[in-house]
């Protein structure tokens, strides 16, 4: 196989991983680095030649999130059209502003450090280490939260701009391959007073501008990349698989967090600890 191309089976596997791990708190970037290495695939999934594939995966994931949260966005934008000074309009403006504030740290820190961090820690063994640490962080969070009364807070509008900025800083941990973006932001939101369901909803709403921005940025770079024959068709299939997987993952997780308040992140934490440790051992041999 040409190491510059991706087979359809490889594309489907990576697309399923992207669609699931982008939302589950287990790190999509970490899995994208570790899984090809474990399977002995020759390609670099983050190489320039695979930009079309990454663009389409992110596009599929973004569409899935927009479809699932269409009612949330519709309520926000309908609220913006309300009467000047109405409570609904003020709440809609506040939620949009929260999302903007929460995105700013990733834009600044990502612009300054993302490429450096991924160049420094972008190997599969580093990803396995950070995946292990991601699991410990999830487990530690649930242990700390178990000592507190059950949170009743669900309303995203109850967050302050300082809360949003702090959650945005948590998101920046995900520039390290193996640290989950959704996991980090859910943890940040939990510590700012939301319950698991509210934290997950805010995390997934935050993800949409970030993923769309990444898609646009990668699409602009794609103009200068020579795409091997047939790879655009493979990328399109990957996008559809990622979209379906992301939609199913989002629906499952929102229902899961609605029904589980205590220790909700623990199963994902145990998975990350085990997967990180096993991957590190295998890759070391």
From Swiss-Prot:
The chain crosses the membrane at residues 12-34, 49-69, 93-113, 120-140, 159-179, 234-254, 263-283. One of its GO terms (cellular component) is plasma membrane. It comes from the Bacteria. Pfam families: BacA (PF02673). GO terms for molecular function: undecaprenyl-diphosphatase activity. It catalyses: di-trans,octa-cis-undecaprenyl diphosphate + H2O = di-trans,octa-cis-undecaprenyl phosphate + phosphate + H(+). InterPro entries: UppP (IPR003824). Keywords: Antibiotic resistance, Cell inner membrane, Cell membrane, Cell shape, Cell wall biogenesis/degradation, Hydrolase, Membrane, Peptidoglycan synthesis, Transmembrane, Transmembrane helix. GO terms for biological process: cell wall organization; peptidoglycan biosynthetic process; regulation of cell shape; response to antibiotic. It is found in: Cell inner membrane. Its EC number is 3.6.1.27. It is a multi-pass membrane protein. It is an enzyme of class 3 (hydrolase). Its main location: membrane. Belongs to the UppP family. Bacitracin is thought to be involved in the inhibition of peptidoglycan synthesis by sequestering undecaprenyl diphosphate, thereby reducing the pool of lipid carrier available. HAMAP family: Undec_diphosphatase (MF_01006). Catalyzes the dephosphorylation of undecaprenyl diphosphate (UPP). Confers resistance to bacitracin. This is Undecaprenyl-diphosphatase. It comes from Gluconacetobacter diazotrophicus (strain ATCC 49037 / DSM 5601 / CCUG 37298 / CIP 103539 / LMG 7603 / PAl5).
């Amino acid at each position: 196989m040409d190491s510059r191309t991706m087979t359809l089976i490889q594309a489907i596997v990576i697309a399923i991983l992207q669609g699931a791990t982008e939302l589950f708190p287990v790190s999509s970037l970490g899995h994208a680095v570790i899984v090809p290495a474990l399977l002995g695939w020759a390609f670099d999934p983050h190489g320039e030649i695979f930009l079309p594939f990454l663009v389409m995966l992110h596009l599929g994931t973004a569409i899935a999130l927009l479809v699932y949260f269409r009612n949330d966005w519709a309520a926000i934008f309908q609220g913006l059209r309300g009467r000047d000074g109405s409570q609904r309009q003020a709440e809609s403006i506040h939620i949009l502003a929260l999302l903007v504030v929460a995105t700013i740290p990733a834009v600044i820190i990502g612009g300054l450090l993302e490429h450096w961090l991924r160049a420094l820690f972008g190997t599969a063994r580093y990803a396995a280490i950070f995946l292990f640490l991601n699991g410990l962080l999830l487990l530690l969070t649930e242990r700390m939260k178990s000592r507190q009364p059950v949170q009743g807070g669900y309303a995203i509008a109850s967050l302050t701009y300082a809360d949003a900025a702090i959650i945005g800083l948590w998101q920046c941990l995900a520039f390290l391959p193996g640290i989950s973006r959704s996991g980090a932001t859910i943890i940040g939101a939990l510590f700012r007073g939301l319950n698991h369901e509210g934290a997950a909803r805010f995390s997934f709403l935050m993800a949409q501008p970030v993923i769309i921005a990444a898609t646009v940025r990668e699409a602009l770079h794609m103009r200068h990349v020579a795409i091997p024959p047939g790879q655009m068709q493979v990328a399109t299939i990957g996008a559809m698989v990622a979209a379906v997987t992301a939609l199913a993952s989002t629906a499952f997780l929102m229902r899961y967090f609605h029904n589980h308040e205590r220790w909700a992140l623990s199963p994902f934490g145990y998975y990350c600890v085990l997967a990180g440790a096993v991957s590190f051992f295998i890759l070391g041999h």
